[in-house]
Amino acid sequence: MAIINKGMSRRSFLGLTGSVAAVAGLGLTGCGGSSSDEGSAASSTDSANRGGGVITAGSAYAPSSFDPASTGSAVGLGANWHVVEGLYGIDYHDYSTFNELATDDPKSVDDTTFEVTIRKGAKFSDGTEVTADDVVASYTACAASATYAPFFQPFESIEAKDASTVTVKTKVPNFSLLKDRLAIIRVTPATQTEEDRAKQPIGSGPWMYDSISDTEITLVPNPEYNGEYAAEDKKIQYSILTDPTARVTAQQEGSTLVMELVTADAVDQLESAGCKIDNVQGFGTRFIMFNVAKEPWNDVKVRQAVMYALDTEKMVSNTFAGLATAASCYLPKSFTNYHEASTVYKTDAKKAKKLIEESGITPGAITLRTTDNEQIKGMAAQVKNDLDALGFDVTIQTDTSPATYAAIDGGEAYDILLAPGDPSCFGADPDLLLNWWYGDNVWMQTRCPWKESAEWQKLHGLMDEALAAEGDEQQKKWNECFDIIADNAVLYPVVHVKTVSASWGDPSTAPTARPSMASRALARRACPSGALRPSRRKTRLSLYAGCRPLGPYPHS
């Protein structure tokens, strides 16, 4: 999929290999591999002496649950990719899939039945063998998750044929996205409890968790790993630096080799210090959600009035310093399946006021809930100004993502939510992206209870038709979906952001960092959501900055 900034040179993004939610991602070579094109930044001396160091990263997001079957923790998702393998992995540069635990592509038995064989000798870091029963148990946990379940609606079942083979049955004949969906299932031991998975999952990947705390996450090599990309350094260390000033300071001083979410005002500062700055336009949204169970938000005219009242140009200029784009579709223009929606919310104060008049309501006091994401807080001030001008009396209530969603899930009668989100860490096809927020899940059932509406039913009918179609007919169905969600605006992107990452292009020049030879071969790759993620050629440091908020543990 054409989702990365094609203007970036190969030299700027050496060995591009990862990209999802969408933006600049920089990876540190921490694992070996057979590909030669990924290590070209290192000299022959580097190659002979690589490894043995510590890879450090500044994470903008605090951890919560690490359960691979349900986590919505941005940093947890990224770290898990190094620790917990799936049958397949996703190369986030182009969303292609590659083998992890699987030895080959799924073997077709018939149009809806496929078999996948597990890598011989694969073991979890606790020394137990990976079996088909572990795959089945992991799938069952994912499919039972309130938020992951929509991803697996095309599946009929996954069963163990024998100890090393699973049989996958699909509802959609010749399901073209089979490997993509299987890649979402990260395999943990069937014996590991949900509680233990949430604290510290066990995996079969090149790395394993050494420790997890509120301030630091440490990964060390998995001695049981027998795959292609064994860990070469002795440690990956994520420093949890949610405060942007602390994160920038750590990067500037060299305490971290790479950081995510560089704020616009820190770009020049870090460049002057010698850091490499990269950004890529991606799916990463800053979205607005209405409590449609509460008046007046059950009236589409009121929701549309709010959307037209928002001065997105000021937000893009003032909050993002130009590093964002106002939404003209559910997908950003850089995505292959983009199609301008029938309704595009360009700022129009007169139209907003007319819609309020037509609705017959009298604007009153409302609460704008926001997460504590710095960009969201910046946007919130503009949203308040715009809605106050429309006649509302807006009070901003800011909290952490876990606290915000806990309150909403607990039944709080909120008015409007402004938050970040990006499901493209799971894939980039429109069906997956649509199902994240508009699927039969916690979002449409309780957070934004639109599920019982005729419009939602029509949307899902079109989504089902699109999944079974191909080519132009499939795109036509998706375009209709984009129009429905834009017209109704129950939950919709305000902007798609460009996420900015910083790294020491030559980590040996960092003021206080003492990287290994492997780390000096710093390899960059674009991550459509701005996260640092693994690649098919070499596992990369994975911050997963672009993916949020997810499920019961949304991070923003």
What do the PLM-derived regions correspond to, one by one?
Residues 58-109, 140, 202:
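N-terminal lobe/hinge region of extracytoplasmic solute-binding protein
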Residues 93, 181-231, 235:
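Gly/Pro-rich hinge or "lid" segments in bacterial periplasmic/extracellular proteins
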Residues 131-138, 163-167, 205-206, 233-235, ...:
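Alpha-helical secondary-structure segments
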Residues 150-190:
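Surface-exposed binding/hinge segments that line
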Residues 195, 224-269:
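Ligand-site clamp/hinge motif
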Residues 321, 325-358, 374-378:
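Structural transition elements
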Residues 395-398, 402-404, 432-505:
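Extracytoplasmic/peripheral linker and loop segments enriched in polar/acidic and small residues
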Residues 501-537:
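Long beta-strand-rich cores associated with HINT superfamily self-processing modules
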